[in-house]
């Protein structure tokens, strides 16, 4: 009997319980994702110098974000960065996600060299009706952070519409702001 690759699924209930407002924060909680490669906080990562857009690329198994394929509802997302070296997970607000599927085995035989370490598929809520907002604010010493997300959805006889977005802002925290650094 043939066996397939295991799929790690993070469903809507787990997404809500995680208490995150961004997709990148949610993906950090999946054990198979060792990092988000080049990101706004890790510019020294692989391809970090070319990441002027501050994108967050998914990094399975620590090989690099260019070896992990990121899909939105089974379709490829356009690449980010000045050299197209990664796909930005932060372009999809976490509030719109119905579930996240992670295949942490190589999928290059199906998807090509973009999926050497695996595939992450973001599945959106396509039939949401109503309004929902999430606001998170945090303060610690000389650092503060604000994250806001909202989703709106409506449906009619022949279709539906879902619009979602998120906003995040944080102050910088330099090493000199810490007395022990």
What are these regions (language model features)?
Residues 106, 128-153, 163:
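Short strand-turn segments of transmembrane beta-barrel domains in outer membranes
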Residues 136, 158-181:
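Periplasmic-side early beta-strands and strand-to-turn transitions of outer-membrane beta-barrels
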Residues 25-26, 56-59, 88-90, 114-135, ...:
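N-terminal periplasmic accessory domains that precede
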Residues 28-76:
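Extracytoplasmic beta-strand/coil segments of soluble accessory domains associated
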Residues 5-28, 48, 57-63, 86-90, ...:
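Short, polar/charged loop or turn motifs at beta-strand boundaries
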Residues 15, 27, 100-101, 120-122:
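Non-catalytic regulatory/gating segments with a bias toward low-complexity or hydrophobic composition
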């Amino acid at each position: 009997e043939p066996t397939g690759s295991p799929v790690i699924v993070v469903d809507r209930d787990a997404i809500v319980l995680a208490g995150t407002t961004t997709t990148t924060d949610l993906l950090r909680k999946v054990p198979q994702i060792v990092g988000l490669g080049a990101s706004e906080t890790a510019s020294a990562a692989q391809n970090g110098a070319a990441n002027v857009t501050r994108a967050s690329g998914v990094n399975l198994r620590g090989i690099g974000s260019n070896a992990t394929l990121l899909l939105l509802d089974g379709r490829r997302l356009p690449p980010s960065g000045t050299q197209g070296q990664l796909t930005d997970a932060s372009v999809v607000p976490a509030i719109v996600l119905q579930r996240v599927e992670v295949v942490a085995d190589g999928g290059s035989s199906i998807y090509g060299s973009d999926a050497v370490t695996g595939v992450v598929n973001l599945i959106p809520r396509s039939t949401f009706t109503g309004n929902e907002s999430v606001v998170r604010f945090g303060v610690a010493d000389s650092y503060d952070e604000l994250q806001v997300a909202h989703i709106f959805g409506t449906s009619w006889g022949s279709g539906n519409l879902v619009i979602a977005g998120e906003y995040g802002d944080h102050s910088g925290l330099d090493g000199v702001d810490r007395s022990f650094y």
